[in-house]
């Protein structure tokens, strides 16, 4: 399974059943420190807040950090709690597993490396918020949220 190279990316919300939905879409957008990460169109005023640094760590997991201008401190994808539909928070960057979606080259499922009995904890979208979703580890559960990583 190919791993994502370290770099600067925009993250577009897609699904495993429709990894290339065409023009438009919503992108992971920072609102501010300790605020929920939003899903917004890639247009002003959101465009400048959709740039993320992905860094793979020695353990094979990755951090996703906001790479904006004039950032007073480092923050990225984080959480206060890993409950169903809890928001992804822009906070102290946590580690995630980036799992390539089969038959794609740039679409990944973002999973929290947390052991929950029988479920994977994945980053999806609800309304215009990035949230944590639970899916059965056996792969059932239908269409899953995924993210197209477009290099800047």
Swiss-Prot record:
Keyword list (alphabetical) reads: Protease inhibitor, Thiol protease inhibitor
Gene3D superfamilies attached to this UniProt entry: 2.80.10.50
Q: Name one GO molecular function term.
A: cysteine-type endopeptidase inhibitor activity
Concerning InterPro entries, the annotation shows:
Prot_inh_I48_clitocypin (IPR019508)
Record has DNA-binding as a keyword:
no
Q: Does the keyword Glycoprotein apply?
A: no
Pfam families under this entry? Inhibitor_I48
Summary of subunit composition and partner proteins: Homodimer.
Annotated family: Belongs to the protease inhibitor I48 family.
What does this protein do, in the record's words? Binds and inhibits cysteine proteinases. Inhibits most strongly papain and cathepsin L, more weakly bromelain and cathepsin B while it is completely ineffective against cathepsin H.
Provide the protein name: Clitocypin-1
Species for this entry:
Clitocybe nebularis (Clouded agaric)
């Amino acid at each position: 399974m190919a791993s994502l190279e370290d770099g600067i990316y925009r993250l577009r919300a897609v699904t495993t059943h429709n990894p290339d939905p065409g023009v438009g879409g919503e992108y992971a957008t920072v609102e501010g420190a300790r605020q929920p990460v939003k899903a917004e169109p890639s247009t002003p005023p959101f465009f400048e807040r959709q740039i993320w640094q992905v860094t793979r760590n020695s353990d094979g997991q990755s951090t996703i950090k906001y790479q904006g201008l004039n950032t007073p401190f480092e923050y990225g994808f984080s959480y206060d709690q890993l409950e169903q539909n809890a928001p992804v928070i822009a906070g102290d960057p946590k580690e995630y597993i980036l799992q390539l979606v089969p038959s794609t080259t740039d679409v990944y499922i973002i999973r929290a490396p947390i052991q929950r009995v029988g479920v994977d904890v994945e980053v999806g979208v609800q309304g215009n918020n990035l949230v944590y979703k639970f899916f059965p580890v056996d792969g059932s559960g239908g269409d899953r949220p995924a993210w197209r990583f477009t290099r800047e």
